[in-house]
Amino acid sequence: MKRKYPYSLAKGLTSTQIAVIVAVIVIVIIIGVVAGFVLTKGPSTTAVTTTVTSTFTTTTTIPSTTTSTPSNTVVFYTWWGGGDGGEALSQIIPAVKQYAGLQMQTYSIPGAGGTNAKYAILALIQAGKPPAAFQVHYGPEMISYVEAAPNGIHTFVNMTPYLIQWGLLNNAVYAVLQAGAYNGTLLSVPINVHRGAVLYVNTQLLREYNLPFPYNFSTLVYDTVQLANHGVSPWIIPGGDGGWDQFNVWEDIFLYLAGPQLYNELIYGTLNFSNPTVQKLINETNYWFLNFTSYNYPGWQSMSWEQAFALIAQGKVAFQANGNWVTNYASYINVTVYPPLPQYISNSSVSVVETPFPGTQHYYALVIDTIGIPVGPQEQQALQLAHFWSSYQGQEVWTKYKAVTYYKNGTDWYAQPAQWYDYQQLINTSEQNFVYQLSDGGVFDDVFAQIDSGLLTLQQVGKVGLSAWNSTLVSSMQQEQNEWLAAAKLGLGYLGFPGHPFAGYYPPWVTNPSAYGLTNNTQKTSNSVMLFLLPFLALPLAIASIDNKYYLLK
């Protein structure tokens, strides 16, 4: 399935386009419901009811959000459902009701990585009927909404003072907040941290053929060839998610070859494609991408990432590159996923291990789910929801089945052994070794769609498509840079806080703004800086009004 969006989120949409998008989203959702929901427990589709709980709904219409919504009800738009966050939602919804006194209505719009949900949310915002709260990634993704919204940044609640008040600036892993701060301004609230750039390995297959565990890239290549020689399909890289899985594989290979700084330059579109070293790295990445995809499981074209993991769990393939949301899905189908430690790799009863993509074990690819809150009639309820969900108490409930927490003093409350390993890696990774995963919020939404489409096509056609793919990559990165420059004019020109950029990297328009037609004022300051520097100043009455509940903060 090939998805391509010819318009840019950053450019805004006409009312006609909005209507078309809403109609398309509704049709997509109806198709998903008829098919038995987007998520399945394996390659064979099993129909499930569309209502997971009384408050968790796969919607077939776009519900309006108006002042008639009950005062204790909050509407949350998401792409989670079934195995991808469904279990965690079933736990957080009653907790929100018990501790925050809110009835949480969750509308799920299926699509890997938010492919469909992002456009439905945007359409509602542009139509002046935003949801009370919505799921959004950290990284530049949130700026896509800012640049397209009718009132720009003023469409959304500035969350910086709230996160200060709630203690996250002091108690969360700092890199997590840097990944969502735009020159010091935080526009959404983190609720979990996923790890991208991981590889799922069926260790029983490796034992059957006496093959070593792929701790490094050369071993991964060796295992791939040996498994193929034994008639086993080494890889499953599904195509049913529109190119998102291909993007995962390509970026993981690039991270191994190029390291974190050059990877983070892709976030800003500043990678120098004229540099011979960069050209060599891109060529090598393309080579290994085509190499691994040539060993793909038959029928990959129509499969989703969930169906792909079912093949891993069943021992039909050895490798799947993705993020650790797959580990949460494993809980849904009753599969235990273990970390890459010797006692598990050598254990004959262990079948699935999650490991950092070979060669990237010292890096941490962040994928951070957050809550965005539009200014509107349900703003206070949405703030109450975000307050509880982001609290230590809320994190114990939510991240048991979803990703890991960002609190620096968390304990092992997780459902899967691999989650605790990922959490320990998170709190012990050096600042310069973080990246923000490109395929899950690390690029603007229109760039994301272009790269997805380009890589899916490259896998389909092979080497003859390299020239077209390279052209797509270069033009996409130019678009990425242009959209960051537009953000810079709004004072949102980089990830991080003044003096503390994400991963220690400033894009060049921050260090040399005049070369990009910018002024120093648009780069070095933002309206939230004083709030960041002076957290003990009196805060707005709105904060006090939602701070009347105490949530456990250890």
UniProtKB/Swiss-Prot annotation:
Subcellular location: Cell membrane
InterPro entries linked: Bact_solute-bd_prot1, GlcS_GBP
pH dependence of this protein's activity: Optimum pH is 1.5.
One term under GO cellular component: plasma membrane
Primary location: membrane
Topological region Cytoplasmic: 1-17, 547-554
Ranges in the topological domain labelled Extracellular: 39-525
Transmembrane intervals: 18-38, 526-546
Regulation of its activity: Binding of glucose is strongly inhibited by galactose and mannose.
Record's bilayer topology term: Multi-pass membrane protein
Gene3D superfamilies: Periplasmic binding protein-like II
Record key words, sorted: Cell membrane, Membrane, Sugar transport, Transmembrane, Transmembrane helix, Transport
Record flagged with keyword Cell membrane: yes
The protein's assembly and partners: The complex is composed of two ATP-binding proteins (GlcV), two transmembrane proteins (GlcT and GlcU) and a solute-binding protein (GlcS).
Function of the molecule: Part of the ABC transporter complex GlcSTUV involved in glucose uptake. Binds glucose. Can also bind galactose and mannose.
Family (UniProt): Belongs to the bacterial solute-binding protein 1 family.
Name of protein: Glucose-binding protein GlcS
UniProt organism field: Saccharolobus solfataricus (strain ATCC 35092 / DSM 1617 / JCM 11322 / P2)
Lineage: Archaea, Thermoproteota, Thermoprotei, Sulfolobales, Sulfolobaceae
